[in-house]
Amino acid sequence: MAGRSPAHGFCDDEQTRRLLRSRPPRQALAWAGACLGGPVTSARALRGGMSSAVHLVTARRPDGRRGQAVLRRYVRPDPDEPDPAAREARALRLAGAAGVPTPALLAVDPDGTQAGVPALLMGRLPGRVDWWPSDLDRWLERLAGLLPRIHGTALPPGETIPRFAPHRQENYRPPGWARYPRVWERAVEISRDPAPDLPAVLLHRDFHPGNVLWRRGQVSGVVDWLGTCAGPAAVDVAHCRVNLLTLGAEVAERFTTLWERAAGTVYQPWGDVVAIVGFLDDLRGDWGRERLLVEDMLARAVAGC
């Protein structure tokens, strides 16, 4: 969840910050250089998530030309997301082939034998993250329009895409600040029930404005495909809805209306329940006004399930 820091940047923990931002080790740079056709001359840390170190690397080729790529190293293993490099590489191939704007996959080291840890090398997309658009309606319309394109990606027979499973939490008790503890308790029960019988589509699983790049008012790319899986479209819609509470409840609802129009279907509130329960560990801190908006959204969703 982007939460109160829409920039979606690095963790405030100093040890984690060093792990994610420090210059990649020689082994990783040697692998990247071999893929790019020359030694790496620079590596600049990019903003990214919490499980991987992301750097823009520049290599000098024998003919004097420069080659640039994004090196992503999965330096923080997550038992809930095994084989991260292979999983993201598979997602990039599928979504890219379907016309979704994604980074070009240049190379993958699925087990870390060459780069030291599992790693991807990707083309660099133009554009930047934009959480505060000058034209909110157009921004929301284009954001919502991305999801049917992602969800329309064909899943080839025999393709091994993990099935959606809710994120596990350390503690499922209601947050200490909860006004409606019973709502939270019921939400946990719903999240543990079998998912509704809805069509399974390709999910980004971490779709929100912090993972969408823009250039001159147009979407230039969707990044961070680590959590890709197959499941109900409502999972992606809900994840984005909760993150959009940063901009207000009315913005989240407007996004949903635009998605329904683009997808030609009706949103299922089950998605909100699963998404918010999946944020429980993150929601135990001081979230100010946003925590009230999250709880109100959850109460409406529980009532609608």
Language-model segments: residues:
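ATP-binding pocket architecture of kinase catalytic cores
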Residues: 44-160, 197
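Helix-rich C-terminal or lid/interface subdomains of diverse kinases
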Residues: 8, 230-232, 238-305
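An alpha-helical support segment within catalytic cores of ATP-dependent transferases
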Residues: 23-37, 148-205, 300-305
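Short, flexible/disordered intra-domain loops and linkers
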Residues: 16-17, 78-83, 288-293
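Hydrophobic packing residues in well-ordered alpha-helices of helical domains and bundles
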Residues: 85, 140-143, 184, 273, ...
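Active-site acidic catalytic loop and adjacent metal/ATP-binding pocket
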Residues: 47, 52-59, 65, 70-71, ...
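Juxta-kinase regulatory segment immediately upstream of eukaryotic protein kinase catalytic domains
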Residues: 2-40
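Short, conserved clusters of charged catalytic residues that mark active-site
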Residues: 27, 38, 87-90, 142, ...
